Structure formats: C-alpha cells, structure tokens
Amino acid sequence: INKLGIGIADNLLLECALAYDGKVLIAPAMNTNMLKKSITERNLKLLSISDYKIIKTQSKLLACNSFGDGAMAEPIEIFYAVSKELLKEEFWENRRVVVSGGGTIERIDDVRFISNFSSGKMANPIALALYLKGADVCFITTKKLNLRDELYTIEIENSKEMKNFLEDALRVAKKGVLIKPNL
C-alpha cells in the first residue's frame, strides 16, 4: 500500500495497479500498529483521493494473536464493494430513492391484529439493486431481510408509521441528487 501510494512499481502487482486506468479496490489486511502508522494512514488517504477505493478493515483477532483493527474485510463485504463498482451507473449515483415493503400490522388489542400477506421479499432485492447501482436508498420496511448496513433502513409496524415515514422520506428525496464532498 505504501509503495503504491508513492508510485513505486518494483513488482508485477504494483506495475499492473499503476498502469491500470480503471477503478482499483484495495482490501487492506495488517497488524493494528502497521495500520495506525502515520505513513500508512497518509498513503491510504492519498490513494483514496487518487480514485482508489479502500475497503474498510475490521476489528477482530488478528494473525499475530492480538485483538484490534486491521483484519481484512469479510469476503461478502469485498463482494459487495466490487459489485457496487462494477454495477454503478451515472444516472443512479447519489440519487435519493425511497423503497417501501412488507405488510403492516394494525393491532386490535394485545393479542389480535389485522395484517396482510405482503412479505417484502420483492422490496429487499429492489433496494439492494438500487444501492449497487449507486443510489442513496431509504428503505422503509416491516421486515428487514439481510440487507447492507449502508442502506438507510427504517423499520415500522403499522400503516400510520408507514405513511409518516414515507411522507418524510419523499420530502427529503425530492430535494434531488446528493453532492458528496471531496477530500
């Protein structure tokens, strides 16, 4: 990472990374002390400014048998980061989108309720697909099924909550495309 950050290409991997003109994703894995060194932090920031995508490390038991930050991201996290880069479309980038799904429950008393058969199973992949396309997704649901933490999810129960959160989310979404600040 440090060699790449200062442009040293003394092996095939670094030569390819420096010569490639597309998006490069980096999933760091190192000891906490290495990760927290100012030179490593500086080079990671420099690489991210230079249009390299840095996938966040995890805090857990490391190879050196100490607990701390520096473990490589889980394969599923790397998969989603790569998928998001490959699937993103300019039209959807930073565009606010509201997706709702799942059946609401109207309580009659402490034991009984009225509901419907809506599972929310279709809304989940729609929200995920829009996220992977680059949209800023607000997902309002009664049933969150294994979605990304990056998806802003509001869990609700009844139709009144659904209506209120939908109105608020739509009001915010109408403001248009998000402008993400540069470093």
Language-model segments: residues:
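Short, glycine-/small-residue-rich phosphate/pyrophosphate-handling segment
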Residues: D21-L61, F67-V82, C138
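Short beta-strand segments
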Residues: A27-A29, V98-G102, T141, I179-N182
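Helix-loop-strand module that forms the ligand-binding subsite of alpha/beta enzymes
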Residues: I1-K36, P181-L183
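Short, electropositive alpha-helical surface patch
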Residues: E41-T57, R148-R171
